[in-house]
Amino acid sequence: MKQGLFHIVVLALCLAFLSPVAALAQNAETSPQTAVTNMSQTVNVLNHIIFMAQENRGLDHYFGALREYWRNNNFSDISFDGLPQFNPTSGAAPLYRPPRTNPGCDPAYPPPNDCIEDKNSPAVASYHLITQCIENPSPSWNEGHVDWNLHNPLSASPTLNGYVYTGAHDARNNDPPFYDTDGIRVMGYYDDTDLNYYYYMASQFATSDRWFSPVMTRTSSNRDYLIAATSQGYVYPIGTDSKDQKLLTAKPIFQVLQSAGISWKIYVNPENSPCASNPTAQCLLGYSYIQNFQWGHTIPQNFPNKLVPISQYFTDVKNGTLPQVAMIEPASPAGLDEHGSDSDPYPINIQLGAKYVESLVNALMKSVSWKDSAFILTYDEGGGLYDHVPAKPAQSPDGIKPVDLLPGDICTGATGPTCDFTYTGYRVPLIVISPYAKKHYVNHQIADYTAILKLIETLFGLPALTNRDAAQINMTAFFNFNIPPWKTPPTPPAQSTSGSCYLDQLP
């Protein structure tokens, strides 16, 4: 499943005093009914937060070589937990010989056999990808749990050695099979020669090495958390199991904003969709994950000017008319969401997706809206791509167990600690871009991206949606609200689009 850019533009309020912020950060496990201290009573410096979630990329996969970029480009070498070969102890030289962390498929059992992991399996290390297009590994429920521990997915002990197996298993069982039937694409990573714009922005502004997707499964459920801090038990897209067709009754953040009189919009890119010539709210609803919620279906009739085409974003940025909270959906029909290629009419090129994000961010930085905005870029889940850091324990949003597991799925018989919603998914990239974002800053606090909701709630004095967002950090540590470090934004390099794109070989 694809989709994904979410931007939030927030009328805000932040801090003249850091003591209340520290208190909020420490008081993370409050109930959903407990309203957060109204930061608007301090200094109103952020009026817009823009947040965007692209598709299916893990932290090691995209930013694993970030410290190497710093070494080569005169950035101070601060702590960042990327790929082990680029993550030596302070002052030591990089290893450059990546550890072989995942067993591969025994070559004696080629397709149509399933991937067999045994004593003859070659050990596979991470490596630099040359192609900017890869076949999609699956990050779904079963695969995510096998990634956690190949031989015992229900174990409390993560080994993170199942990535190659799941990549191979899915490739061999796809119809038609993928090229990479050995699953080694999951161990590939990119660096600044591929994603020069992202590497520059992550180095200049604020990022994190402990930022996780909310659920150990695929896109749809994670994006439900992005909007409402729960999927109400769904681990698959609604309707995967024919008996599970009900829309979510949980309150999305936009419903709460509407009730509180806080302006909001959802921007959708209609390119290459039927909405291109008819970008009405009713048409655009089909390309927004707000459609998963009952309340979302009231938008076309009741709030049609709040579900709008992406062209309106550029107009709002230019004219200084951004709403207080805005979410930008991914340009999936246009192939600009950075998702792995998966029966698409053409390969999905990450450089083209990054170029699209560049256009959104640069438009903001060059506009009158820059002075009081924050743009939060993240990814909806790790895409089944190797990451050396395991998922972390998390607060269940509402106590609901999985409701749509299929016969034979992991956790349908025996159970384990990752069988409900008390663990996050895997790490995903994050860049916080704002005149108030700290320069060259890495946050190390464990959080999933429902922390974006917590930031909104903190800024506006809103109650938490569920126990999950209530338990998150409020993200104020990413900012310096007293003195804006980036009153004048930097001039980033243009994102390269000259990389090779092919699916029929690796690397």
Predicted regions and their residues:
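Bacterial N-terminal signal peptides that target proteins for export
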Residues: 1-9
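N-terminal pro-sequences and low-complexity stem/linker regions of secreted or lumenal proteins
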Residues: 26-507
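Bacterial Sec-dependent signal peptides at the C-terminal "C-region" and cleavage site
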Residues: 19-27
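Bacterial N-terminal signal peptides
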Residues: 8-20
